[in-house]
Amino acid sequence: MAKERDQNTKDKNLLICFLWNFSAELKLALMALLVLCTLATLLPFLPSSFSISASELRFCISRIAVNSTSVNFTTVVEKPVLDNAVKLTEKPVLDNGVTKQPLTEEKVLNNGVIKRTFTGYGWAAYNFVLMNAYRGGVNTFAVIGLSSKPLHVYSHPTYRCEWIPLNQSDNRILTDGTKILTDWGYGRVYTTVVVNCTFPSNTVINPKNTGGTLLLHATTGDTDRNITDSIPVLTETPNTVDFALYESNLRRREKYDYLYCGSSLYGNLSPQRIREWIAYHVRFFGERSHFVLHDAGGITEEVFEVLKPWIELGRVTVHDIREQERFDGYYHNQFMVVNDCLHRYRFMAKWMFFFDVDEFIYVPAKSSISSVMVSLEEYSQFTIEQMPMSSQLCYDGDGPARTYRKWGFEKLAYRDVKKVPRRDRKYAVQPRNVFATGVHMSQHLQGKTYHRAEGKIRYFHYHGSISQRREPCRHLYNGTRIVHENNPYVLDTTMRDIGLAVKTFEIRTIGDRLLRTRQ
């Protein structure tokens, strides 16, 4: 019993010593518990307008976090990381994504003038938006992308190109980049920029085929600060460059005789009109042709089903470019898209054609596309004259029932003959001679351009017909010359006469899987 009593006494003394040593902490904990209980008691009696939202709470916490971590920076670097640890861009950025700026205060000068200061935050538009870059020769590259339109109109941004070999023992090479603005003044928030990186003529870039990275140093032209973005635009891995491709004396035949570069396809497109267009042109250009289409939201599931048979045959390639909608450029950035197509397929085709999916290329009956192109071989570019067709006036020579069952280019047979100063043209180029291109022609090429090919080749334009998801015939006529809404038209059955041959070609090539295609 005495032993048990002594043990209890020792335990009580130990507890008292523990409480005495931590009395301050216990007081703080008890005070906090008392405050929480008080708040819990008073909250039901507070007015309903008093509230703290979750967003406000997050804001307060984030402000505390930013203030308490004044040196918490992160380096933002995307795109390929170089194997030889070359530093690309190292910009101190706060956790909330805002670049830290040195704070400046206004001053009163000795003469009494108040000197004001201006500090910029964030970006209204990106300095450069990269789409892709391509090798154009043994010492030249092309970089295609977007940049701020006001920046190029009102400032003087510059570009420098740097080749960084994968082998650290090789020297880096720098050269000035030449910018080409291709949009003819049509840009919006963004404009298309093609940067030509041509190194000295006696220099071969990556001569041992050991690999390397091309950097584009893009400046904003700021007169006060040297703001430069270093962007890795192209990485060549070892033994991937085919230098024979760029030797003129070893030039081999291209994979395609004719390659179609399409502009951005957007909107609610008619599957039937796309079906007619692709079947017509696959037949027209022949076996050694290819079609590159760019989906900016216009290739829906129904349209893709029309293209699918031709994709499976290797005649069509579709590029999904919907992400470019983030950057507000002219007509869904079509200038950037066609320039990317030009340089991507530059060494794969002898001729490239640029026109729209509501336009049909035509050569006279006694000619062929191959004979016409041979006659124009001395030119780097030729333009194609437009034949404007009505997209709502149909020829009713076979009666309404048969007319409505015909394809669009068969029944839309009335040509607009109103005299106008000029009409838009489309064009074709030999891509090896072109540095940058546009929508209606290229202004940046070497060699001659031919503008009088209307006797050799033309195109029929059914403006707006591609975006009509209904029967195109709004009015039926039988006459050879008519006037509709004070506009003169003549009957032109050129395309109508080819319809049966195109339908037969489609059936023989891909079968009857598209017979139930809807408007």
UniProtKB/Swiss-Prot annotation:
GO biological process entries: cell wall biogenesis; cell wall organization
Domain GT92: 257-471
Gene disruption: observed consequences: No visible phenotype under normal growth conditions, but mutant plants have reduced content of beta-1,4-galactan in leaf cell wall.
Membrane topology: Single-pass membrane protein
Organism listed in the record: Arabidopsis thaliana
Name of the protein this chain belongs to: Galactan beta-1,4-galactosyltransferase GALS2
InterPro entries registered for this protein in UniProt: Glyco_transf_92 (IPR008166)
Pfam families on file: Glyco_transf_92
Transmembrane region(s): 28-48
